[in-house]
Each structure stands twice: as C-alpha cells, then as structure tokens.
Amino acid sequence: MTVRVEKNGPVTTVIHSRPEARNAMDPDSAEELVAAFTAFDADPDASVAVFFGEGGAFCAGWDLKYASTLEGQEEPLAALNFPADDSPTPRGPMGPSRLVLGKPVIAAVAGPAVAGGFELALWCDLRVMEQSAYFGVYCRRWGVPLIDGGTVRLPRLVGQGRAL
C-alpha cells in the first residue's frame, strides 16, 4: 500500500507514501489515491481532507523508472490501467486529478511538487507550503506536456500572465 488514510474527527488525512521515489506516481499509487479520495467524499462524517507526501516530498511527478519499464511494449498505455471513457470514476495519470469532489482538499506541500505533482497540488482547493516547498514544470524542457489539468488550472488560479 502506497497510500495511507488517517481520520481524526471530521479531518481525513491522505498520505502518499513512496518516499524512496520522492512520492513519484505509478499506476498503483494513482488507483489508491482515487479510492482514498472517493471514500473521503462519500464519508458523511468527513468534512475536509489534508493531502501530503511522506518523507519531505509532496510528489515528484510521474515515476520515470516505472515509465522506462514500458519501453518496447506494443500497448504501453494498457499497462497504465486507465478506466474507459464511460467509467463513473474518472482517473488520470496522476490519479485523483480528474475527480470532482464535494468537500475541500488541502495540499500540505513540503519539498518538490513538480510536473504531475504540481498538477495534484493545483487540483486541491487550497495549498499550504512549507519553506522547503517548491513548484516546477521541468518536463516541458523535453517537450512533455502537463496532461492532468495543470495547464487549465494554473491560469484559473493565478491569471494567464503569471501562468505564462
């Protein structure tokens, strides 16, 4: 299990726990995060979720070591296990970033929140950052776009001029 859920009264804490990979996302983590946030949204006793990455990193984006194992496969996207378009629970590469929840989620960001990790932070309703925290979109250097809503969410949050 790479995701832990802790409850303290109306507060649900969702912890992404892959510190050895700087909490980089892989398909198992993505599925577990979707399940955790879907359960949080359905829980009548839960009012707010706090989301953070264990070990001093919020999320370093997609797990490139995992991605390298897909090389040479005829259908590499099939290994990512994305639900079909008619799925009642939408899931993107970063997991919950396409969910629409009825309760607020707070990102508690420490260390890097880069590429897809930045997109996860943008998905949250509020972002609280430690002094060690930073956002980045380094994947653009190699022509890899943000694919989980970041290019839409960032301008909505900070304005187009600042987002550029």
Model-predicted regions and their roles:
Residues 56-60, 65, 114, 136:
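Short, active-site-adjacent cap segments at secondary-structure transitions
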Residues 58, 64-67, 144, 154:
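Short clusters of hydrophobic/aromatic residues that line enzyme substrate/ligand-binding pockets
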Residues 14, 51, 63, 120-121:
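Hydrophobic/aromatic residues within transmembrane alpha-helices
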Residues 25-26, 62, 71, 139, ...:
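Short, flexible helix/strand-to-coil boundary loops that buttress conserved ligand/catalytic motifs
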Residues 30-32, 38, 64-110:
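An acidic, glycine-rich surface segment that forms the CoA-thioester-binding/catalytic face
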Residues 1-56, 68-72:
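Conserved CoA-thioester-binding segment of acyl-CoA-metabolizing enzymes
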Residues 27-28, 62, 119, 149:
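Generic recognition of short, well-ordered alpha-helical segments
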Residues 96-164:
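Crotonase-fold acyl-CoA enzyme core
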